[in-house]
Design a protein with these regions (language model features):
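Catalytic core of membrane glycerolipid acyltransferases/transacylases, capturing the structured
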Residues: 103-163, 189-192, 196
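An N-terminal domain-start capping segment
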Residues: 14-17, 133-136, 178
Length: 287
């Protein structure tokens, strides 16, 4: 993202939502044609996750997936630049909100659906409680500054650098901050365990249970869906059986429950990421 790109996003924030989404539809269709490497990744992921589908069904879902990807990206225009009242009107929090507001430390399990930034903004704008999330610095300084400002726009939000390690995160939890955690990516073999995800042994970092244990926190899933009015941010009830004494079993349970959330809206999950990239020793790459 360059400075002209950021100016474009600021200008886009003044358009009606339908116009922004329409541009996102066009951009997504274009990306599906031009971004061949990411299209290939998405289709491989879908073959692994949904082998029972026909190839035509997977291609059709991948097309919709690219549209949602582009729409969510352009939605950052109004999410990070529009009038706060207009943002609030487009973000609807539903479900077990009391599990976020009642006393005690909270780790929000926020899977990588395309609405993840909207979910974070909704929580910070509408839940009166400080929160933090883990942030990876972007190589482009202008993009990095823009993303940091956007993600800290509302409420008492703190971005913790991934390079700082565990201690600042645990300290924040023990100080009463909620943690908005997105642990469902392939970050390589370091600290990962191989547990099933759609029946495939998948490198999974057991950070959800780890932070819940160290921070004496309950785990509350927060799943965000793009809708016609903007976004629905659904707060699921806190998991009563999590974490356990077994970090590997916890990682497997997280993936199992994540599959349930994905199956409700597979077209909005982050399939363009190489989720199955890291393989057990001796296994060939899927990609």
């Amino acid at each position: 993202m360059t400075h002209p790109g950021i100016l474009f996003m600021r200008a886009l924030s003044h358009l009606p939502l339908g116009a922004v989404r329409g541009l996102g539809t066009l951009l997504g269709r274009l990306l599906f044609v031009l971004a061949r490497s990411r299209r290939r990744v998405a289709l491989i992921n879908l073959r692994l996750a949904y082998p029972q589908w026909s190839e035509a069904e997977r291609v059709a879902l991948a097309r919709r997936n690219f549209v949602y990807f582009a729409q969510a990206f352009l939605d950052r225009s109004w999410l990070w630049h529009a009038d706060p009242d207009r943002v609030r009107q487009r973000l609807r929090i539903t479900g077990a909100v009391d599990d976020l507001t009642r006393e005690g430390a909270v780790v929000m399990f926020a899977p990588h659906f395309y609405g993840m930034d909207a979910g974070g903004s909704a929580v910070m704008q509408q839940i009166d409680r400080p929160a933090c999330t883990i942030y990876s610095t972007q190589p482009n300084p202008a993009l990095d500054e823009w993303m940091q400002a956007g993600r800290q726009r509302f409420g008492d939000a703190t971005l913790l650098s991934r390079t700082e390690g565990v201690k600042p995160i645990v300290r924040a939890l023990r100080e009463g901050k909620m943690l908005y955690l997105l642990p469902d990516m392939d970050l390589g073999p370091t600290e990962a365990v191989f547990v099933p995800f759609y029946g495939v042994p998948t490198a999974t970092v057991p950070s959800l249970s780890r932070f819940a244990k160290l921070g004496h926190a309950r785990v509350v899933p927060v799943v965000t869906r793009l809708t016609d009015f903007g976004y629905e941010v659904k707060v699921h009830p806190a998991w009563p059986d999590y974490p356990s004494a077994d970090a590997t079993a916890d990682a497997a349970l997280m993936n199992q429950r994540l599959q349930g959330y994905i199956d409700e809206m597979p077209e909005q999950y982050y399939w363009v990421h190489k989720r199955f990239k890291t393989r057990p020793p001796g296994e060939a790459s899927f990609y």
